[in-house]
UniProtKB/Swiss-Prot annotation:
Signal peptide (from-to): none
Keywords: Carbohydrate metabolism, Galactose metabolism, Isomerase, NAD
UniProt-listed Enzyme Commission number(s): 5.1.3.2
Organism: Erwinia amylovora
GO biological process terms on file: galactose metabolic process
Binding site for NAD(+): 11-12, 31-36, 58-59, 80-84, 99, 124, 149, 153, 178
Protein name in UniProt: UDP-glucose 4-epimerase
Binding site for substrate: S124, Y149, N179, N199, L200, G216, I217, F218, R231, R292, D293, G294, D295
Cofactor (UniProt): NAD(+)
Amino acid sequence: MSILVTGGAGYIGSHTVLSLLQRGDDVVILDNLSNASRESINRVEKLTGKTATFFEGDLLDRSCLRSVFSAHRISAVIHFAGLKAVGASTRKPLEYYQNNVTGTLVLLEEMRSAGVNQFIFSSSATVYGADAPVPYVETTPIGGTTSPYGTSKLMVEQILRDYAKANPEFKTIALRYFNPVGAHESGQMGEDPNGIPNNLLPYIAQVAIGRLEKLGIFGDDYPTEDGTGVRDYIHVMDLAEGHLKALDHLSAIEGYKAYNLGAGKGYSVLEMVKAFEKASGGTVAYQISPRRDGDLAAFWADATLADKELNWRVSRGIDEMMRDTWNWQSQNPQGDS
């Protein structure tokens, strides 16, 4: 039996594929490479000495999905594929709903046809909405999302909840991520977005290496200690390990369950800049810009439930996040191309 990883060539997906291969799982990857490179999978295979089956295709292509499910005996799906930029989603809402919601519906329908009933969903802390008290806990009401991206994740969680209620054989876990950062400790894998990065740390790293001129910090007038946004950052390898823990826990649950995966503390944008400067030994040029639509002032996780039920907790802190990011970026100044 194989694990199907959608979006498996992407940042979080490729690190999770590496962890799956390292422990001996058979892995099938489906990715349209819209924000990823085949090279990331080549590097996973080189680091592990193992191979994964790769399909280049889109979730909206039913024939592609059917060929995947007919060619392989899939036991579970880890679903990363989707668009993920909060700001872009406010400008392109239909594109986000089409990819993130409709794409997931097509995937679930093809899973049903193939008799696959185990599903891990890459959700987001943005489902908690603008007015949720911090730290976020799983019992916090979800909704009140501030971007089409967050709403698309919220909608998929509701679809999963309803489908699990209607189909007793279906078991699904939604993992609500906070902000993934860092890279594999080898320096051979990391975040390499196509075009200008949407996330903070790869942008900082590309400024430090000279690929970008300066960092734009969106807002310094938030009600935080230094005025910049505060986020819960989680090392990507801790996040990958969380997916394996969730996968192993599926058999113990009934229906639908959600877990926060975060560090349980927040850092401001300026704190992240200073920590990266410490790790790299250089300076990161930045300028303050207006706030972005949909961004929140501050949030972080309460990941107690994942600790208790999944036996998962972070083991890497901000120093490891910055060290591994700089190691990756300095070894690969042009990314993994």
